[in-house]
Structures are given as C-alpha cells and as structure tokens.
UniProtKB/Swiss-Prot annotation:
Belongs to the glutathione peroxidase family. Keywords: Oxidoreductase, Peroxidase, Secreted, Selenocysteine, Signal. Residues 1-24 form the signal peptide. This is Glutathione peroxidase 3. It comes from the Eukaryota. The gene is Gpx3.
Length: 226
C-alpha cells in the first residue's frame, strides 16, 4: 500500500512539474532576470570568415537565439534541428546565431576556415550547410569570454548546479553563471532583453515549443492592448 501511495505521489509531482531534475539538478530551461541594465544591441561579432562585423542591433525587432556550437560534439546533430527551426520560425521573426567554441572537451579544434567544411563533409556531413549565421570562434566563459556572453550569462540563471568535470572544461576563472557545455541556448526578445536560457541537452523540439508558447503569449498581450 505504501509503495502504491509513493508511486501515486511521485506521478502527481511529475505531472505538476515539481520533480527536481536529475544529474546534478539540471533544469531544461530558466527564465532570465528582469531589470538588467543594457540590451544585446550594445554588442556585435565578426562573421566566421572574418570579413564582416555584425552589430546585433541589426536584428532589432526580432527574436534572437544564441547558440554556442561545436563540430565534434555528441550534440553536433543539433545543427540539423537548428536549420529546421530557423526555416520554420524564421518567418515569425526568429534569427539563430551560432558561436563556435573550443572550451568544452576541445570539440571545436579547427581554425575558422575549417569549421564550415567540417560541418559539410564530416559532422553532420552529407553536404550540410547551416542556414543561420556563424561567427568567429571565441570563448564563452573565462577571462577572455566575449562580452555579449558576459551580458547573457549575467541576465539568466544557470540551468545546472554543477559545472562538470574540470578536466574537460578549459577556462579560468570558473563562475556559477558559466555555460556548462556546447549547444546551450539563450533567447533574446525583440527589445534586446534576454528571455530564456536552455540546458544543452534540452531537445530543439522543446526549445521550439517554449519559443512558440512565448510568442503566442506576447501576441495575445499585444492584441489586448489594442
């Protein structure tokens, strides 16, 4: 009887969303802080070929999904899903931006000029070409982290309590808000303010559902205000 009651309680908690995440208390996503000063439009980055500096204010009025990517990661196949996400939600104002990084397991070892050929012929392979903008390889954590990543991380709580195995993480100093692994994601709203942050293992399909849900809520609020 006690076992049945325990199972019933756990099921109720799971359905209500109250069961704590496993493996070090991960959360599939976190909501970003309100009231942070500044916007993402104060920053920008060089494209992967180094030929153009793109100020992020170029994307004003759109939803921007920031993703730190890697070519030789167990999650590299997310590139395929990100292409599909860009194609599906692009007409609704979503822009995906990818930022190669070699700080997690040394899984982006090549030069900038080697990354696109690697994606095309190795992983995901099969002639794959990203349909979203990639930028120059750089750090997302540590002393030399790109400033816009400092802004994003300070705007949103981390998705996991633990950073991971120090032997596979290549930066110093380590901080609580640091990105945990390749393919962590941040969504920034049309006003340049961060909205959500996703754990790297959260599926792209779940990310899509979260984005669509948020877009619908904002559309409903806008309709009421008219």
């Amino acid at each position: 009887m006690a076992r049945i009651l325990r199972a019933s309680c756990l099921l109720s908690l799971l359905l209500a969303g109250f069961v704590p995440p496993g493996r070090g208390q991960e959360k599939s996503k976190t909501d970003c802080h309100g009231g942070m000063s500044g916007t993402i439009y104060e920053y920008g980055a060089l494209t992967i070929d180094g030929e153009e500096y793109i100020p992020f204010k170029q994307y004003a009025g759109k939803y921007i999904l920031f993703v730190n990517v890697a070519s030789y990661u167990g999650l590299t196949d997310q590139y395929l899903e990100l292409n599909a996400l860009q194609e599906e939600l692009g007409p609704f104002g979503l822009v995906i931006l990818g930022f190669p990084c070699n700080q997690f397991g040394k899984q982006e070892p090549g030069e900038n000029s080697e990354i696109l050929p690697s994606l095309k012929y190795v992983r995901p392979g099969g002639g794959f070409v990203p349909n979203f903008q990639l930028f120059e390889k750089g750090d997302v954590n540590g002393e030399k982290e790109q400033k816009f990543y400092t802004f994003l991380k300070n705007s949103c709580p981390p998705t996991a309590e633990l950073l991971g195995s120090p032997g596979r993480l290549f930066w110093e100093p380590m901080k609580i808000h640091d990105i945990r692994w390749n393919f962590e994601k941040f969504l920034v709203g049309p006003d340049g303010i961060p909205i959500m942050r996703w754990y790297h293992r959260t599926t792209v399909s779940n990310v899509k559902m979260d984005i669509l849900s948020y877009m619908r809520r904002q559309a409903a609020l806008g309709a009421r205000g008219k």
